[in-house]
Amino acid sequence: MLILRGLSNIIILGNEQMDKSFKNFAMMTGATLIMAVGTYFFKFTNNFTFSGITGLAVLVAKTGLISAADFSFITNMLLLVLGAVILGKQFVAKTAYCSILLSVTLSLLERVYPMSHPFTDEPMLEVMFAIALPAFGSAILFNIGASSGGTDIIAMIVKKYSSINIGKALIVSDIAITVLGFFVFGMKTGLYSLFGLSIRSFLVDNFIESLNLSKYFNVVCAKPDPICDFIVNQLHRGATICDARGAFSGSEKYIILTALNRQQAIKLRNFIKKEDPSAFILISNTSEIIGKGFHAI
C-alpha cells in the first residue's frame, strides 16, 4: 500500500513538472516571437539603434553588406557557440533556445515579409511599439529565468572572468551604439533611439512587476475559522492567524495574514463581504513574494 502511494506521489509530481515545463516552453516561445515582431516590424524599418545586438545590426545594415536580420542571426549564433565553449554547464539551455528562435524568426520574417518602409508615417507611434513589444517579451523571459541571448551572453562571459560591473558595462555599450545612430541616420532618428533607450529598462522593470503582482491581505475579524477554511480549501493557499485586541472596543480580535494572486484576491474579498461584513480588510499590492506557492528562494 505504501509502495502504491509512493508511486502515485511520484506520478503526480512528474505530471506537475511536465506541466510546468510545457508552460515555460510556451511562454518562452510566445515571448520570443513578440520580441521578434517588435524588432523586425518597428525597430529595423525605422533604423532605431537602441538595445544591444539588434541595435548594432541596424548600424551594420546601413553599409549594405548584410541585412539587420542576417547580422543578428550570425552574431547570435557565434555568441551561442562562444557561450557553450566558455560557460559549459553554466550556459543555460533556455537562453540558447530563445536566442536561436529569435534569430531564425527575424531571418524568416525578412524573407517572407520584406519591408523597406515603416508601417506608418508616425515615428513616435513606431518607436513606442519598437520599445514596448521587445520589453514585454524580455520581461516574460526574465521572469522565468531565461533571456534572448545577445549581449546577455557577453555579460555572462565577462562576469565569469572579471569583477566588472556588468550592468554599467552594458549600459555604456548601449549608449555608444545609440550615439552612433546620430551620425549614421541623422538627428531625428538618433533622438528617437535615445528616447527608446532611456525608457526601455523602465518598461521591462514595470512589466516584470506587473507580471508578479500579488495581493497581501490583513483581515481583522472576530471569527477567523470560516475565512481560513475558504483560503485553505477553496483557494489552496496558506494563512497565519494572530491574536489581537480592538483599541476602541477592547474586544478580542484575530488578524489573518495571507498572500494571493489577483484572481484569488477577488474571490476572497467577495467571500468575506458575504460571510463577515463587519471584518476590516487591508489589501496591499506586492510584486515579490518568496515562498511555497510563489517564487522559490
Each model region followed by its residue ranges:
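Core subunits and conserved enzymes of cellular information-processing
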Residues: G14-K223
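Short, Lys/Arg-enriched N-terminal segments with co-localized hydrophobic residues
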Residues: M1-Q17
